[in-house]
Amino acid sequence: MKLSDEDLSRLNEFWLYCSKNQYFNVGYPESADFDYSELEKFMKFSINNCGDWREESNYKLNSFDFEKDVMRYFSQLFNIPHQESWGYISNGGTEGNLFSCYLARELFPTAYLYYSEETHYSVDKIARLLNIPSRKIPALSNGEIDYQQLVTQIERDQQGNPIIFANIGSTMRGAIDDIGRIQNDLATLGLDRKDYYIHADAALSGMILPFVDQPPPYSFQDGIDSITVSGHKMIGSPIPCGIVLAKQHMVDQISVEVDYISSRDQTISGSRNGHSALFMWTAIKSHSLSDWQSKVKLCLDMADYTVQRLQKAGIEAWRNKNSNTVVFPCPSEPIWRKHSLATSGDVAHIVTMPHLNSTAQLDALIDDVIFDLSPEYGLGHVIGQN
């Protein structure tokens, strides 16, 4: 296997581009704070985690033992006994959401799917793929679902088995839907807890809330039926990945036997990247509880710093509690393109991830936003000037 000099040059140019932009992600919640150099030696192996990690597979080069450790870790993190849960390492949050909605649809074939307008765009695709009737519910100003509108819509639809897609950290505003309130509201409609399904999309905040004081409801102990977390966000990974975790007795209803690999399979994708299990295993084994707490505190402190600087300049910046997503009015296109900011309508956001570990890394961006949105204040108030 040999590349031409021209092709090698192209690869080298791309490596330089990646090196230059490695720590530039401020509009999207990918962490560059990782080091998996110990795993480089495994890159010569085709590691495929096809099927169920609980079962022996006829394909020998799998990392099931590591995947099992990862899933045990997350079952403990999200307060469900390991033996009462099942999940797997996915290709990312969208696959985890797809798996959970598929599971819910199989449990409640006539159900409608309810989610807020702040929910990740993948859910629109999932509803179409699974042919699930769906209702997009308006959101409150902070990004949470409008609880009254949710109840009203379920009542109007006469839905006895609704599927609730809850945001545990919404994409643009980092909003956390109140799982406790949703359950209380559904009880007022006469729905028993066993008659509906709650999925928690915790792509980013799933690795934040377990490490803060007095978090809002987010776990199985709080009433969810499944949860997804991204591996390339707070954890950090060179390859997009994630986990999905659900209740064992529910998953058993969709299991199938696969002769080709001599194993059971409940996953969506079939062949799965076995290297992702090694990345996630290395991350959880190399970080203690206090390490995660420190990492989360750093992110929230940097978010606070960003809010304070923008507010001091008269810019309406804010963040939800326990969120590292800072929301503010959308700057001009040259600014949001320069800094790769995510925008939606009239707002933009900054996501302070672990690799942004000093205010100096944020100041150039903040200065540009201030000059763009509040130019009169910006003159003479740039960091470093008297």
Curated annotation (Swiss-Prot):
<dbReference type="GO" id="GO:0019752">
    <property type="term" value="P:carboxylic acid metabolic process"/>
</dbReference>
<dbReference type="GO" id="GO:0004398">
    <property type="term" value="F:histidine decarboxylase activity"/>
</dbReference>
<dbReference type="InterPro" id="IPR023523">
    <property type="entry name" value="Hist_deCOase_bac"/>
</dbReference>
<protein>
    <recommendedName>
        <fullName>Histidine decarboxylase</fullName>
        <ecNumber>4.1.1.22</ecNumber>
    </recommendedName>
</protein>
<dbReference type="InterPro" id="IPR051151">
    <property type="entry name" value="Group_II_Decarboxylase"/>
</dbReference>
<dbReference type="GO" id="GO:0030170">
    <property type="term" value="F:pyridoxal phosphate binding"/>
</dbReference>
<keyword id="KW-0663">Pyridoxal phosphate</keyword>
<dbReference type="Pfam" id="PF00282">
    <property type="entry name" value="Pyridoxal_deC"/>
</dbReference>
<dbReference type="InterPro" id="IPR015424">
    <property type="entry name" value="PyrdxlP-dep_Trfase"/>
</dbReference>
<dbReference type="InterPro" id="IPR002129">
    <property type="entry name" value="PyrdxlP-dep_de-COase"/>
</dbReference>
<dbReference type="InterPro" id="IPR015421">
    <property type="entry name" value="PyrdxlP-dep_Trfase_major"/>
</dbReference>
<keyword id="KW-0456">Lyase</keyword>
<keyword id="KW-0210">Decarboxylase</keyword>
<feature type="binding site">
    <location>
        <position position="120"/>
    </location>
    <ligand>
        <name>substrate</name>
    </ligand>
</feature>
<comment type="similarity">
    <text>Belongs to the group II decarboxylase family.</text>
</comment>
<feature type="modified residue" description="N6-(pyridoxal phosphate)lysine">
    <location>
        <position position="233"/>
    </location>
</feature>
<dbReference type="InterPro" id="IPR021115">
    <property type="entry name" value="Pyridoxal-P_BS"/>
</dbReference>
<comment type="subunit">
    <text>Homotetramer.</text>
</comment>
